[in-house]
Amino acid sequence: MRPAARMPNLTRRSRVMIAVALAVVVLLLLGPRLVDTYVNWLWFGELGYRSVFTTQIVTRLLLFLAVAVVFGAVVFAAMALAYRTRPVFVPTAGPNDPIARYRTAVMARLRLVGIGVPVAVGLLAGLIAQNYWQRVQLFLHGGSFGVSDPQFGIDLGFYAFDLPFYRLMLTYLFAATFLAFIANLLGHYLFGGIRLAGRSGALSRAARIQLIALVGFLMLLKAVAYWLDRYELLSHTRGGKPFTGAGYTDINAVLPAKLILMVIAVICAAAVFSAIVLRDLRIPAIGVVLLLLSSLIVGAGWPLVVEQISVRPNAAQKESEYISRSITATRQAYGLTDEAVEYRDYPGNATATAQQVAADRATTSNIRVLDPNIVSPAFTQFQQGKNFYFFPDQLNMDRYRDEDGNLRDYVVAARELNPDRLIDNQRDWINRHSVYTHGNGFIASPANTVRGIANDPNQNGGYPEFLASVVGANGEVVSPGPAPLDQPRIYFGPVIANTPADYAIVGESGTPREYDYETNTATRNYTYTGSGGVPIGNWLTRSVFAAKYAERNFLFSNVIGENSKILFNRDPADRVEAVAPWLTTDTAVYPAIVNKRIVWIVDGYTTLDNYPYSELMSLSSATTDSNEVALNRLQPDKQVSYIRNSVKATVDAYDGTVTLYAQDEQDPVLQAWMKVFPDTVKPKADITPELQEHLRYPEDLFKVQRALLAKYHVDDPVTFFSTSDFWDVPLDPNPTASSYQPPYYIVAKDLAENNNSSSFQLTSAMNRFRRDFLAAYISASSDPETYGKLTVLTIPGQVNGPKLAFNAISTDTAVSQDLGVIGRDNQNRIRWGNLLTLPMGQGGLLYVAPVYASPGASDAASSYPRLIRVAMMYNDQIGYGPTVRDALTDLFGPGADATATGPAATEPPAGQAPQPQGNNQPPAAAPPNRPGQAPTPQQPEVPVAVPPTGPTQLSAGKAAALQDVNAALDALQDAQRSGDFAQYGEALQRLDDAVNKYQATN
């Protein structure tokens, strides 16, 4: 027989070159990770959250090492046993036996193969395992929920913290044992313990014992898996059922089947182990086949029979107990218990007089006419200032107190720097990263008014009224409102961070370099003085950042001095997710003025995906609406069955400081993470009153809850099973929308306290199941006293939903004719704003839709959308006009607009006198009257709850009459609270007399 060819020996030079090549490859693979690790070490330290970084690194490293060692050791042991117990003499099948050649090659590199393969397997397993560090930490630090599951009576902490870890361990034991089986099988085959030559082949005693032992251990692991499957039944979804969790078939067929299969698996494992002694391979083969057949017959066949024969004919009755479990668990898991949600019957179609509408001051004075999804171009046109400043396409809503102490909602935005808008030499490295470093200003517009009436030739009407807190031309901070601000410079924000290689080099290094503001004669620069930023004054950090950003200017530019710092990772949500990696953040991040500083407020959620009997849903699907689709701003596609808005986070817009506050201190998941990362989350008591005033009920949580309330408002399990009383989230009726209607932040009368005080709330209408009639109206309070309370107004009958209301408004003869004239020959692009649904009067609903037009003239200012009309609908009646006042008067009659907010004063063109404000101003393009409607008489000026921004001079008599109107309104509200109908009627008459007196007074 010809001897097998030997592997050629490598020369010393070849070995050195191979070693160098391997070192270069390792450096290329690990170098960027080492650089990123060091940069993150610096970044977390600068933020004060280095313990978060080190805890992650240590946990990942220990998990990697533990799993790598276990997998490597198991595979090594399997290979070593196969090698150590190999036959002394191994016959070959001839000179061309391929196994002999492989055997020779392996023997020539035995140490490399014997160590390299286990090391490679261990490294791969460790790399995968370290991604599950959160599951391990929750297992180590998780506590109890104080609530037990309805089937086994086990605390829910077992399902949240323990069961996922046990399943993870079982999965890795399966994988390790299976890999050991494969390694041992190949080893015995390679070294002759298993031979396939001849009719029956041969199997050595050592190979039989080792392989059978591994198969038996796999069966024992399968028995453990059947045991754990019992608990996972409580959070799985069976196809065709309208609820999550174990149903009748699962409890009465699948659950016993799991126990039976577990016993069969143990018996089969014992049978397999017996083959070690009995030396009969038919026994383990029979055991494996028996387990497979049992899983098909007992595990799948029997439940199918029970489902088809017993459950299907009487599904509603059979499943009612388990539906009740699902209703209770879902309400608990998503914060929809009776303590959090109040249901009230609400007519939805009650009639309302002009006096009743005027008496609803909290709502009528705050009717929102600015759509934050439309007015961003107007912000850009009038408040951009420089080409490199920018506002996001979708602005935000927040509330502030006006000068009279009244709660008002505002469209707010931070004027950020957008590096993508730099041009020409502004884009070079020095300008991009050390000159244009920050934004400037907080812009707010009252959402219930605009500057003047659109189409008035003497005024630039229809645009937002801007309150800009900025660095002024003299370097002083100009802060007219809505709250005092000391530092308007913005170094951190979502716009500035939405650029690749986003970083700014700041700090004292010679003369001030950062662009700040301009005077009439010069440009003024600024030097950053905040605490944020990683120092890069030494050569080590400069070299590290040069490697990170592949930018040699870090090494050679004189812009960087010993006091220089680098600002990076400037997106507020990303910063929060970095220091709290266990949080899922809301897609909406909004700016607010808190304690005279601009901060970004970020809502953080803790979630679970295995809460027993709770509805399992896609977070991405549940939070999708027309706004998110338009911006392509969607939540990750993760499954959740439990969610809490457990953390409120703030990010300082100037220095980037991240502060985490515990919003839901009773959340067991939050409590577990606070044990993992102690001292990183501040208690709820540390939330200042100023910050509390600007915390909003988060949009994504609200959208998840409204989707669940569509089903889980039903108490009766039989009705739930039939789905006959379900609701639907309405589609956005706007012609340009393509998804569900988003919820809207508004200031209106307080539904949580059920009084006429003003409240900032997040609201949504709900339709009947697969119909366009209203079923409910949901309001979530953001007020500090009632924060998080959900009020659900259930509406009987056939009250028009958003789609029907919008169709009625847009097809109304007067509306369509007027807008047809305005948009004739494409002179103007008509855009409908958000359709608001507002509870009004003593049981009615008012729909309000602002209408915008973007003229096509060459004038740059006129190419931006301005408010031209306000359309309303109440009980199938349409109101329409240039202002809220006009629309209310058109809809309810004279006096309905007594407490509505009118347009603010505007600056007249040069050389012209100011025009009077109010309804006595001649409308340049008043909407036509409806067919059969008498011409509307010109109404005199009427009282308003909040004076317009421009100066208004009233006569002594008129001022006294206005005081009488306000006194009558106060008396009417007192009568409403007292519930005395006689007193209420007298108060209404008093208000009517006061309004008539005001209108008659000159």
From Swiss-Prot:
Transmembrane residue ranges: 16-36, 61-81, 112-132, 174-194, 209-229, 258-278, 286-306
Pro residues: compositionally biased ranges: 937-950
Pfam families for the chain: UPF0182 (PF03699)
Region (Disordered): 891-958
Keyword Membrane appears in the UniProt entry: yes
This protein's GO CC annotations: extracellular region; plasma membrane
Transmembrane is among the record's keywords: yes
Compartment(s): Cell membrane
Keyword tags: Cell membrane, Membrane, Transmembrane, Transmembrane helix
Lipid bilayer topology: Multi-pass membrane protein
Biased composition (Low complexity): 893-923
PANTHER family assigned: UPF0182 PROTEIN SLL1060
Family assignment from sequence similarity: Belongs to the UPF0182 family.
The protein's name in its UniProt record: UPF0182 protein Mvan_1814
Species: Mycolicibacterium vanbaalenii (strain DSM 7251 / JCM 13017 / BCRC 16820 / KCTC 9966 / NRRL B-24157 / PYR-1) (Mycobacterium vanbaalenii)
